[in-house]
A protein has these predicted regions:
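Exposed, low-structure sequence patches enriched in small/polar residues
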Residues: 1-282
Length: 282
């Protein structure tokens, strides 16, 4: 992947960026780019080695009352209680630097921390997006599956890689830090200064008919990498998972128990898991 980004910030907390990007996704023996064509009951397959796209992305960001702490290398926002709004649109151009498709892809994001005084705070992330054109599955909206045992923001701990494909979605990521609301009432535990954490993540998704390839005649699309196509897109029920955990163990450790709430009957999935995080917070 190669990209060039120009960013402009204004004093009214508004900024925009323009990105030129060329990206190539290469097939492997595990994830193949296969097209099929059936004639007179005989199905033939052709395989592409890669998928190339060239696109322009325009992004808008508005963060009222945002403040930063900055050093020589980077900067960090110190006002998470104020909202951040993001809006971006990608336009793909066929025929430029090997690009094979024309397409449009729109994304929206909202970030904010809600304080509840002595009852802690909740970090809220709301996102939505849509791919407007017919495109092969590497260019669809694929949820971020966390395949590790660590806690990762904006990812799903119990979702398999490429388990669901979407061309439109709406998602949420809620993390409630209770600030010792319950554990501080237990005398011996109170001295440890442990902190309770509850997470709730989920996604509504949809894959339109134009982006659902026929296994016997895919046309310009690729076959999905799984034989069971019901595994590849969400129904009316959203994907959801919930987690409960304890943070500030030995001042650096957080441990979560995560449980998958929906689509629990699919083959090869994890219904629950343990995730950890190491980090020092000030």
């Amino acid at each position: 992947k190669a990209e060039l980004t120009y960013t402009k910030e204004f004093h009214n907390h508004f900024s925009f960026n323009v990105t030129l990007r060329n990206r190539k996704d290469i097939a492997s023996k595990f994830i193949q780019f296969e097209r099929t064509h059936t004639t007179d009951g005989t199905t033939t397959s052709t395989f592409a080695n890669d998928v190339t796209r060239s696109e322009v992305e325009i992004g808008l960001r508005y963060a009222p009352k945002e403040k930063f702490i900055q050093n020589k290398w980077d900067r960090n926002s110190v006002t998470p209680e104020h909202p951040v709004f993001l809006l971006s649109h990608k336009i793909g151009f066929k025929g430029i630097l090997g690009s094979e498709f024309n397409y449009h892809h729109t994304e929206f994001g909202f970030y904010k921390r809600f304080w509840f005084s002595a009852f802690g705070h909740t970090d809220c992330i709301i996102k939505a997006g849509k791919v407007w054109n017919k495109v092969p599955y590497p260019m669809l909206i694929i949820p971020n599956a966390n395949l590790s045992y660590t806690i990762q923001r904006e990812s799903y701990s119990l979702m398999n890689a490429m388990e669901f494909f979407n061309d439109e979605y709406a998602s949420w990521d809620l993390t409630y830090n209770m600030n010792g609301l319950l554990l501080n009432r237990i005398p011996l535990i109170r001295k440890l200064k442990w902190r309770e954490v509850i997470t709730f993540r989920g996604m509504f998704g949809h894959l339109s008919e134009k982006n659902r390839p026929d296994p016997l005649n895919t046309g310009g699309l690729f076959k999905f990498p799984y034989e069971n196509y019901q595994q590849c897109y969400l129904g009316t029920m959203p994907y959801m998972e919930v987690g409960v955990g304890i943070a500030n163990i030995f001042k650096v450790l957080r441990v979560d128990y995560v449980r998958r709430l929906t689509y629990r009957d699919l083959p090869g999935i994890q219904k629950w898991g343990i995730r950890i995080e190491l980090g020092v917070q000030f």
